[in-house]
Swiss-Prot record:
Gene3D superfamilies: 3.30.230.10, GHMP kinase, C-terminal domain (3.30.70.890)
Catalytic residues of the enzyme: 14, 145
Swiss-Prot/TrEMBL catalytic activity: 4-CDP-2-C-methyl-D-erythritol + ATP = 4-CDP-2-C-methyl-D-erythritol 2-phosphate + ADP + H(+)
Pfam families found in the cross-reference section: GHMP_kinases_C, GHMP_kinases_N
Species of origin: Pectobacterium atrosepticum (strain SCRI 1043 / ATCC BAA-672)
EC number(s) stated in the UniProt entry for this protein: 2.7.1.148
Keywords per UniProt: ATP-binding, Isoprene biosynthesis, Kinase, Nucleotide-binding, Transferase
Enzyme class: transferase
Self-association state and partner proteins as the record states: Homodimer.
Protein name per UniProt: 4-diphosphocytidyl-2-C-methyl-D-erythritol kinase
Length: 290
C-alpha cells in the first residue's frame, strides 16, 4: 500500500520551559531536568523521494557544510540502518529543500528538529516501517534533543535529555526574541561558573515552583545582548532563556497580549509570536491533521 504523499513537513521549534543542571558525567555530558514544549512555528522541509540513493540538500545553509548538516546526516543514517536490515525501498534517495526560519545557535532546537523531521518523513515516504522507538534511538545518535522531536509530545526530560516522560504543561502564547547572535552550547556548558548541582526533583514539585533556566545567569553575564533582551521583556511578562540561548521568551495568556508587546518592541529586537503546543506540528502532519 502506497503511503499518503506528503511533501511538506514542519520542523517546529521547542522551548525549554525550565532547565536545571543536576550534575555532570565523567564523559563531560551534563545531567539535567527540563520541560520541553513545542511551538506552532518553525522551519519547513519539502522532501521528494528519488529512485536512486542520492541525498541532495537543494538549499544549503550558510556556514554549515552539507556533510556536517544534520539534515544530510539524518537521511544517511536512516539509509545505513535500512541497508543493515536489508530494507531497500524502491525509492531510497531524496531531494530536500528547507525554508529556514529558526536561528542557528538560538536554543530553539532548529538543527535537532530538522534531523527529526527528516527521519520521520523519510521513514514514511520510503515505507521503511521503523517504529518510533527505533527512530528515536537513531535520532539520539545525532543529538540529545532529537528524540523528543521524533516522539512528538511535550515531555519532561532527564538524564542528558534522552529520558522522556510525557507532560501536559499549559499551552500559553509566547513572544520569542532573538538577539541576532548565536551562542554555541559548549560555551555555556563549559563555563566554570555554570550551576551544576541543582537538586533532583520530581515533575510535580518542579511544576509548582517558579520556572528557572540554570544557563540564563551565564548567558546574561557573558552576552550583553541577552541581558538587554531579557531586561526589556521582563518589564512586560515573565521571561527567560530557552536552552543555552541565545533566544529568550516571554509568556502570555493570549495571542493579543503577546502581539501588543511585540508591537512596542524596539527596532533592535527580532521576534515572533507563537503558541506553545503539546502535540508537535510534525506529529499532527503525520497523523493527517493540520
Amino acid at each position: 500500500m502506497q503511503p499518503t504523499v506528503i511533501e511538506t513537513w514542519p520542523a517546529p521549534a521547542k522551548l525549554n520551559l525550565f532547565l536545571y543542571i543536576t550534575g555532570q558525567r565523567q564523559d563531560g555530558y551534563h545531567l539535567l531536568q527540563t520541560l520541553f514544549q513545542f511551538l506552532d512555528y518553525g522551519d519547513t522541509l519539502t522532501i521528494r523521494p528519488r529512485n536512486d540513493d542520492q541525498i541532495n540538500l537543494l538549499t544549503p545553509i550558510d556556514g554549515v557544510e552539507n556533510e556536517q548538516n544534520l539534515i544530510i546526516r539524518a537521511a544517511r543514517l536512516l539509509q545505513q540502518h535500512c541497508e543493515r536490515r536489508n530494507i531497500r525501498p524502491a525509492q531510497f534517495g531524496a531531494n530536500i529543500h528547507i525554508e529556514k526560519c529558526l536561528p542557528m545557535g538560538g536554543g530553539l532546537g532548529g538543527g535537532s528538529s530538522n534531523a527529526a523531521t527528516v527521519l520521520v518523513a523519510l521513514n514514511h515516504l520510503w515505507q521503511s516501517g521503523l517504529n518510533v522507538d527505533t527512530l528515536a534511538e537513531l535520532g539520539l545518535q545525532l543529538g540529545a534533543d532529537v528524540p523528543v522531536f521524533i516522539r512528538g509530545y511535550a515531555a519532561f526530560a532527564e538524564g542528558i535529555g534522552e529520558q522522556l516522560t510525557p507532560a501536559n504543561p499549559p499551552e500559553k502564547w509566547y513572544l520569542v526574541a532573538h538577539p541576532s547572535i548565536s551562542i554555541a552550547t559548549p560555551l555555556i556548558f563549559g563555563d566554570p561558573e555554570l550551576t551544576r548541582n541543582s537538586p533532583v526533583r520530581d515533575l510535580e514539585t518542579l511544576l509548582n515552583q517558579t520556572f528557572v533556566n540554570d544557563c540564563e545567569a551565564i548567558a546574561r553575564k557573558r552576552f550583553r545582548e541577552v541581558e538587554q533582551l531579557l531586561s526589556w521583556l521582563l518589564e512586560y511578562a515573565p521571561a527567560r532563556l530557552t536552552g543555552t540561548g541565545a533566544c529568550v521568551f516571554a509568556e502570555f495568556d493570549t495571542e493579543f497580549a503577546a502581539r501588543q508587546v511585540l508591537d512596542q518592541a524596539p527596532e533592535w529586537l527580532n521576534g515572533f509570536v507563537a503558541r506553545g503546543v503539546n502535540v508537535s506540528p510534525l506529529q499532527r502532519r503525520l497523523s493527517g491533521q493540520r
